[in-house]
């Protein structure tokens, strides 16, 4: 059975259609996926030039086509997503689902794989890479991950992939990668006012072998291996970066694992009234940025801060003590309730953002379940501070990284 799911669009004036292809995460795969996505975003065999491809999309009343790879745990999802005005909003008899879908597949099924376009994309990406990692916080995260996954280097890059593979790729490499990608597990997702018509128009294009393969992944999450490390790296910037990474196990009950880190991240650093913000400012008298993020698919709870290089030990102590406090069962109920309200608001507002709806369809397809935003709101309402404490107790400090 072909992997396709088009939901009924009942609230937006624009429709969305996307093809998603799943391949294993490795630095080389991510580099080639990034390069291919950049090339396809620029031009295609039927629209051989940036201007020609842009004009083709403009004629569809400024349709937007986004092509990019994204890392989900141990997988890369190559995403081809088009957002376009619903035909019933336009008084143009020549503008319809069929025309939009034809152009969508004209572009994504027919890449222009030549040396000139590839060199342009490589230069673009090299410039983006250097600019992105010139920012200390981005560089610190990159090096933190490489250290975290030092025993599993295939997982050590979440963006760009290997710069060496990206720079050294040949046209033949990209052609082979594109051919292999067509065999990868794939799914077509979307939202349209007339989902049946959209499905009928899409079906003839979904002939690649991957659309018949199971898209769901049973072991998407990368297990955190307990192997503590501390690393200090010098840097020329005035501010330093500190990253404290905690691992946690995969055997937690699903809801506890899914929402424990989410609640803890908001509790510690969700806004300026959260624990870390107030404690850092009270003790150090400075408005340093503090961030706590739960990387659910990586079994990684990460707390990071941009700091005065002379105060990183004080900031580290505050971070570590704040986590230990929760592990000891000490929770500020007022801050916890604020976190609950903030998370509930996020899920209540999510259905009004079309892009988030498609992301939910994708994550549900990857995990093989149907979780709605209503389910998430209910889970947040029922989640207790005792459960957050239970989650915190499973954390083990696995890496301290300092960019100073």
Predicted regions located by residue number:
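Catalytic Zn2+-binding segment of zinc metalloproteases
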Residues: 41-47
